[in-house]
Amino acid sequence: MIVIPAVDMKNGKCVQLIQGDPNKKHVELENPVEVAEKWVSEGAEMLHLVDLDGAIEGESVNRELIKEIIQTVNVPVQIGGGISVRCTESNLIEIGAKRIILGTVAVENPDIVEEISKKVGKEKVMVALDAKDGKVVIKGWKEKTKYTPVEMGKILEEKGAGSILFTNVNVEGLLTGMNVEPVETLVEELEIPVIASGGVTTIEDLIKLKAVGVEGVVVGSAIYKNLIDLKEAIKACR
């Protein structure tokens, strides 16, 4: 199982938010490129980049910063935030993204997943499923859908998603620990790989996730707040 550090960008800085609220930050660091280099120097084999400005604006805003990180580090990156128009997917793949992460746009219109998968390759298309109280939520976690993660996951899998990024919104950014059960259910029900995110606080959380068969785990606040040592986490998950 791969441990994937998150580098979330807002206004050109690296931040970690509480419950996705731009007004509530655990962390704010000046240079996202230096942060990315730090995690790679500690053994990260992949990075998770999120353009938070893009998520709000609906299109990729920090594209040049993302490009600089990709050119600077020597590991694959997956990119999310504001990927809602077709030209953006191609642009991000062209600048070197291993995977692009589709969110609300894919849940609202799963046919887009099929279209983009045919265009750039299934393996490059990840869809983010954010769940709150057992239902998929969209539009910055503000709107609840009628679908469970498994129901939507199966639709997206059929449409050509190459992988799923599952976030438990109930625990995201709170540093309260991981709820493994919904992740395990998703892994059991889907054929495509699942990456978990949200609430990881200890290496024990990571070991539990490895046991249920996730391909990887995105870690954010816990490594920025020094609750988890990245080197030790990577070692424990090999």
From Swiss-Prot:
Q: Which domain of life is it from?
A: Archaea
Q: A single GO molecular function, which one?
A: 1-(5-phosphoribosyl)-5-[(5-phosphoribosylamino)methylideneamino]imidazole-4-carboxamide isomerase activity
Q: Where in the cell is it found?
A: Cytoplasm
Enzyme Commission code(s) on record:
5.3.1.16
Note the NCBIfam families from the entry: 1-(5-phosphoribosyl)-5-[(5-phosphoribosylamino)methylideneamino]imidazole-4-carboxamide isomerase (TIGR00007), PRK13585.1 (NF010112)
Q: Which residues form the active site?
A: D8 (proton acceptor), D130 (proton donor)
Keyword annotations from UniProtKB, A to Z? Amino-acid biosynthesis, Cytoplasm, Histidine biosynthesis, Isomerase
InterPro entries this protein is in? Answer: Aldolase_TIM (IPR013785), His_biosynth (IPR006062), HisA_bact_arch (IPR006063), Isoase_HisA-like (IPR044524), Isoase_HisA-like_bact (IPR023016), RibuloseP-bd_barrel (IPR011060)
A Pfam family (short name) is His_biosynth
Query: What reaction does this enzyme carry out catalytically?
Result: 1-(5-phospho-beta-D-ribosyl)-5-[(5-phospho-beta-D-ribosylamino)methylideneamino]imidazole-4-carboxamide = 5-[(5-phospho-1-deoxy-D-ribulos-1-ylimino)methylamino]-1-(5-phospho-beta-D-ribosyl)imidazole-4-carboxamide
User: Single GO cellular component annotation?
Assistant: cytoplasm
Family statement drawn from the similarity comment of this UniProt entry: Belongs to the HisA/HisF family.
What pathway does this protein act in? Amino-acid biosynthesis; L-histidine biosynthesis; L-histidine from 5-phospho-alpha-D-ribose 1-diphosphate: step 4/9
Q: What is the recorded name of this protein?
A: 1-(5-phosphoribosyl)-5-[(5-phosphoribosylamino)methylideneamino] imidazole-4-carboxamide isomerase
Q: For this chain's UniProt record, which GO biological process terms are given?
A: L-histidine biosynthetic process; L-tryptophan biosynthetic process
